[in-house]
């Protein structure tokens, strides 16, 4: 069992626990990865095993505002990145590096990095049917973005922060080789912060199959998008309204659940 938490010093700590009789064995806790955080915000937070069996870890840019240290575009730091590691290596190391990670062997680059140019990708998930990777990345003040990386990607994508916020200029600089979001929306009219979700693969709402369900923390509505074959996006606002959505979950049958800051857990059963 793996967990990602912010410790009492404000740093990111990914830990491993033995699992027995349906419970984590707290005495077995082992640090897998510890990352110093310079500020108290933008810690990221999501972790998930990919279809390839490796552990993916989302880390924000380190916080403050505007990425003052340029972490998003720097390959020398883990901040502002999506990482990909082997949490159970041989030889006594805390974790291993998959040999096909995109920056293995590159001078000055951290080999753990799978993707970069992210501001605060605190929620991401894999499509259980296709293996596609979906990332909800919180913007600075103007734009919220959703990124999608197709299954089978070789990694190394640059999603633009802080040169770009979404697909729009932010700090300036060359945008060559950057990957734009598949969907973005402007902040305003009650929106403030995207909460990434899951591609719906359940049976309760057949017409939602293949749609990526997400939310905005401030707006409260559940939203859904679906990519067309030509790369354009269909969008719909779902009926469900839940305030302060902080996370989503998906059960073994593909049904989607939303969690709110108030402590509620809600299953999506209709549009």
Predicted regions and their residues:
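Repeated scaffold domains used in trafficking and secretory/extracellular systems
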Residues: 244-247
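Acidic/polar, glycine-anchored loop/turn motif associated with catalytic or activation segments
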Residues: 146
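Short turn/helix-capping motifs enriched in Asx and small/polar residues
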Residues: 68-75
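Blade-edge beta-strand/turn elements of extracellular beta-propeller
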Residues: 17-38, 75-120, 130, 172-189, ...
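Mobile, glycine-enriched helix-loop/loop "lid" segments at the mouths of ligand-binding/catalytic clefts
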Residues: 89, 150-177
